[in-house]
């Protein structure tokens, strides 16, 4: 698949359109065929100067994206291949006290696209 990545921090000229392996959805995950991804100020800042956490380079940004489900990992229910989805900027753990109380918007261990996980500047993302 193709992805837009950077190998060093800097201006937009550091972005490269590259071939990378297509991810496979793990248990409980889906493979999203990305159809749209915004250029977010957060992503621009990460590319230009990094963050408090070091990103493993090369890296794929894209904190906000949408698409359709291309494949289902084992155990996935409630969605079908072809369903259109919008991917929330953070992935809650679903195990902390807040997630268990239905307040996953304040999850204690949420992972964020573009920071802890490669983002949507790619043809496919496992989510």
Regions inferred by a protein language model and the residue ranges of each:
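NAD(P)H dinucleotide-binding glycine-rich loop of Rossmann-like/cofactor-binding domains
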Residues: 33, 91-127
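Short beta-strand-to-turn element immediately C-terminal to the catalytic PLP-Schiff-base lysine
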Residues: 6, 47, 70-72, 99-101, ...
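Extreme N-terminal starter segment of soluble prokaryotic enzymes
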Residues: 1-2
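Glycine-rich beta-strand-centered segment in the early N-terminal region that forms part
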Residues: 21-38, 50-97
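Extracellular beta-rich ligand/substrate-recognition surface
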Residues: 6-14
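Cytochrome P450 core scaffold surrounding the K-helix E-X-X-R motif
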Residues: 41-48
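Generic structural detector for well-ordered beta-strands
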Residues: 19-21, 126
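A generic structural signal for well-ordered coil/turn residues at beta-strand boundaries
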Residues: 16, 26, 81, 120-121
């Amino acid at each position: 698949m193709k992805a837009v990545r950077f190998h060093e921090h800097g201006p937009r000229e550091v972005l490269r359109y590259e071939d990378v392996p297509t991810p496979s959805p793990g248990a409980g995950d889906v493979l999203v065929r990305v159809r749209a991804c915004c250029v977010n100020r957060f992503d621009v800042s990460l590319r230009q100067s990094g963050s408090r956490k070091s990103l493993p380079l090369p890296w794929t940004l894209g904190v906000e994206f949408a698409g359709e489900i291309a494949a289902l990992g084992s155990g996935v229910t409630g969605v079908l291949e072809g369903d259109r989805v919008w991917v929330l900027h953070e992935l809650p753990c679903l195990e902390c006290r807040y997630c268990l109380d239905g307040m996953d918007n304040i999850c204690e261990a949420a992972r964020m696209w573009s920071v802890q996980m490669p983002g949507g500047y790619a043809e496919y993302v496992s989510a």
